From Swiss-Prot:
Organism: Homo sapiens
Bilayer topology term: Single-pass membrane protein
Name of the protein: Uncharacterized membrane protein C3orf80
Subcellular location: Membrane
Signal peptide: 1-35
Main location: membrane
PANTHER family: HYPOTHETICAL PROTEIN LOC100362176 (PTHR38505), RIKEN CDNA 1110032F04 GENE (PTHR38505:SF1)
Length: 247
């Protein structure tokens, strides 16, 4: 005698929702039914994952893949194309982390601070003009490498220039007596190449090549050449540019 949704006390109650199980079953059947292949198309027997398709020609009948399987095939093809790139990225990441673990970056110490196990220099000796302080802590910096290369070239110039002047009476002291600090801080302006008087008696390139081709017994030099001091001002025997012909 009571209508639906009305209780005995006269209060209205919402009707119960329909069960979800039948809806889920219908949805599953709708998804599975299109993916089920098989069967035949006139005289053709389609495979398990194929179905009959309408061709452009009404009389032609053919089998085609199901939409779900065609989509999965396209995804698999795309993943195979990217598999090489993905493998390279994974190998790069592994190598990077191994390099960071095996070869960590060196610690940077502030300028003037001694490393562990190194004696600190006296105050004021760690600057660019301090000769007794420790070298710059940043050993692998490009500026320090350039300074060391410049110091080596300056040392070679000092050796060649100072030695020639000492033998020729130029009055310059032996550069070996100079301290390492003086060699490092000396300005390139004061470094000069040997004078022409000191090197004009050296053989030319052609003469050097001829001397290398000749045996030691065939090379004979004048007595005046052997007795002439380097940088001397005696008269040149051939009247040329100070070079002696080979005899």
């Amino acid at each position: 005698m009571w209508g639906p949704g009305v209780t005995a006390e006269g209060l209205s109650v919402a009707p119960a929702p329909p069960p979800l199980l039948p809806l889920l079953l219908l949805l599953a059947l709708a998804l599975v039914a299109p993916s089920r292949g098989g069967g035949g198309c006139a005289e053709l027997a389609c495979g398990e994952r194929e179905r009959c398709c309408d061709a452009t020609n009404a009389t032609a009948v053919r089998c085609c893949k199901l939409p779900l399987h065609a989509f999965l095939d396209n995804v698999g093809w795309f993943v195979r194309k990217l598999s090489g790139l993905l493998i390279l990225l994974v190998l790069f990441a592994i190598g990077y982390f191994l390099q960071r673990i095996i070869c960590p970056s060196p610690r940077r110490y502030p300028r003037g601070q001694a490393r562990p196990g190194q004696r600190p220099g006296p105050p004021g000796g760690a600057g660019p003009l301090g000769g007794a302080g420790p070298p710059d802590d940043d050993d692998d910096s490009p500026a320090l490498l350039r300074d060391e290369a410049a110091a080596g070239s300056q040392d070679s110039l000092l050796d060649s220039g100072g030695g020639g002047r000492g033998r020729g009476g130029g009055g310059r002291s032996d550069p070996s007596c100079a301290s390492e600090h003086e060699m490092r801080v000396v300005s390139p302006v004061f470094l000069q190449l040997p004078s022409y008087e000191e090197v004009k008696y050296l053989p030319t390139y052609e003469e050097s090549m001829r001397l290398q081709q000749l045996s030691p017994g065939e090379v004979v030099l004048p007595v005046s050449v052997l007795g002439r001091p380097r940088g001397g001002v005696a008269a040149e025997p051939d009247g040329g540019e100070g070079r002696y012909p080979l005899i």
